[in-house]
Amino acid sequence: MIQRTLQEKIASILNGKKAVTIMGARQVGKSTLLKMMLSDRTDVMWFNDDEYDVRELFSDITSTRLRSIIADHRIVVIDEAQRIQDIGLKIKLITDNIPDVQVIATGSSSFELASKINEPLTGRKREYKMFPLTFGEMVNHTNLLEEVRMIPHRMVYGYYPEVVESVGEERAVLKELSESYLYRDILSFDKIMKSAKLVKLLQALAYQIGSQVSYNEIGQTVGLDSKTVERYIDILEKSYIIFRLKSYARNLRNELKASRKIYFWDLGIRNAVIGNYSQVESRTDVGNLWENFVIAERLKKNHYDGSYAQSWFWRTQQQKEIDYLEEADGEIKAFEIKWNERKAHTKCPVIFTKAYPNTDYKVITQKNIESILL
């Protein structure tokens, strides 16, 4: 089994007093990880909240009944916890009234789960995000040389665990993931009724990775007003399908100040959405795929490392651009991301170096990818 980065972090706080929440898209391995970690224990109680009777059980429950149900169990796992009404209050009932029991809750939507647990569980929880497999996890599973060789494959099929483990069946698995799981939680949100428009929106975003996104222009393309586009994008982001990268602006008048790019957390899902599994050698979007790959993997690494770095891209009105920036503790790191090795010596724009003279600048290609992802 592929070792997950979160395993050690979660293991270190098991049997503690605080609840644990693990949020991430469906099928990234949240339940698999917990089952593997807790398989040798007999004091674990599992609730799968995709099941109707489990949701009914929690609908109107008291601490007395919870104590009776939990009995001698010391860990209670609540899977897909966002589906339970007032789940934060239910977890608080357990943590406040049954102090010897630790709750571990998983959720596939921060839009729902975070809003339901943050206030009731203030100071009572440890929160983690879980992503599809990472470049670093796969390097640890095999080795650096092997995973670098696999990068073109990952850029097409992504890092979902079942996809990685289903060699030769990647398209079938991605089809099921994108059709059966991708929209399950999103379409259950209040007022998300235009499912066909949502699919068109996601397809439009898939074609624009690496490019600046205008809510007005996308709205005209898919037939939605700009406010609805922004709301749907917010929900897609909080369902761990996409993420936004904003433009960096500090010192120059001609820097773009309110722009954004949108990327996918997993390129297999991105390619499934538009039905394009062509190999990278024949693709016209290979540069955009590589940019998405590097930035998504860097953000995953930063999250697991506990980094507080803020992430941006930089661009001027004269179209001078840097693909990816990080700022932490007043220090800036700038990365230009190039698939073509012949562009490995691309210089940093002079206007940027003058405005931010102490920036650490680096061009990222396949040959030095470990310098940013390990």
Provide a role label for each language-model segment:
Residues T106-S110, K116, P132-L133, K367:
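A short beta-strand-to-loop transition that corresponds to the Sensor-1 phosphate-sensing loop
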Residues M45-I75:
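Short glycine-rich substrate-engagement loop in P-loop NTPases that contacts/grips substrate
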Residues Q3, S12-T21, A25, S31, ...:
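A cross-kingdom feature that marks ATP-driven nucleic-acid transaction machinery
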Residues I70-I87:
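Conserved P-loop NTPase "ATPase switch" module shared by AAA+ and STAND
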Residues G88-F111, N118-P120:
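Conserved catalytic/switch belt of AAA+ P-loop NTPases
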Residues K129-E297, H303:
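Interdomain hinge/linker elements that couple catalytic modules in large macromolecular machines
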Residues F111-R126, T142:
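Short regulatory helix/loop adjacent to the ATP-binding pocket of P-loop NTPases
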Residues L57, Q82-I91, S115-K116:
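Conserved ATPase-coupling elements of RecA-like P-loop NTPase cores
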